[in-house]
Design a protein with these regions (language model features):
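Cytoplasmic membrane-interface "Motif A"-like loop-to-helix N-cap segments
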Residues: 2-14
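Alpha-helical transmembrane segments of multi-pass secondary-active solute transporters
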Residues: 9, 69, 92, 100-105
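C-terminal ends and interior cores of transmembrane alpha-helices
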Residues: 15-29
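MFS-fold secondary transporters
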Residues: 23-27, 42, 116
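Hydrophobic core of transmembrane alpha-helices in multi-pass small-molecule transporters
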Residues: 32-48
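Intracellular juxtamembrane helix-capping segments at the cytosolic ends
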Residues: 48-61
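Multi-pass alpha-helical transporter architecture, strongest
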Residues: 54, 98, 105-123
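A late C-terminal transmembrane helix in Major Facilitator Superfamily
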Residues: 60-96
Length: 123
C-alpha cells in the first residue's frame, strides 16, 4: 500500500475478491480446480485488504472521526458477513443456484472497488 496508492490497492483487492467469487461460481461438475483456486484467492484477497483499508481510513477521515467510523462499520461488517451473506448464499442455493449467489456478491465487490475511487482525502 505504501508503494502503490492505498486506494488502488484496496480496489485491486476488491477486484481480486470478485474474480475469486466468479471462479467459485463455476459448477463442480465442470471442474473443481476453479472453485479451489477461488477459495484460496478469496481468503487471500480479504487478508490483503485490511492494512491498506485502514490507511485509506486514515487518509480520508480525521483522528476524531476514525473511532466513530470504526465503531459503526466493524459491527455492521460483522452482521453482513456473518448473517446477511450466508443467508443470501443459502437462499440462492435453495431456490436458484449457488453460482448466482457468488456472482451477485462478486458484482457487489466490483461496485465496492469502484466506490473507493470516490473517497476524498481530508485536507
Amino acid at each position: 500500500a505504501d508503494r502503490f496508492n492505498a486506494k488502488r490497492t484496496v480496489s485491486a483487492c476488491f477486484l481480486l475478491h470478485a474474480v475469486a467469487l466468479c471462479l467459485m461460481s463455476v459448477d463442480a461438475s465442470v471442474s473443481r480446480i476453479p472453485a479451489l483456486c477461488g477459495v484460496f484467492l478469496q481468503a487471500a484477497s480479504m487478508a490483503f485488504v485490511f492494512p491498506p483499508l485502514f490507511k485509506v481510513f486514515a487518509q480520508c477521515f480525521s483522528a476524531d472521526e476514525q473511532p466513530i467510523l470504526l465503531s459503526l462499520t466493524m459491527p455492521l461488517a460483522g452482521l453482513i458477513s456473518a448473517g446477511g451473506i450466508p443467508f443470501f448464499i443459502g437462499y440462492c442455493g435453495e431456490y436458484y443456484t449457488f453460482g448466482l449467489a457468488f456472482l451477485t456478491i462478486a458484482a457487489m465487490s466490483v461496485a465496492s472497488a469502484v466506490s473507493v475511487a470516490y473517497l476524498k482525502n481530508r485536507e
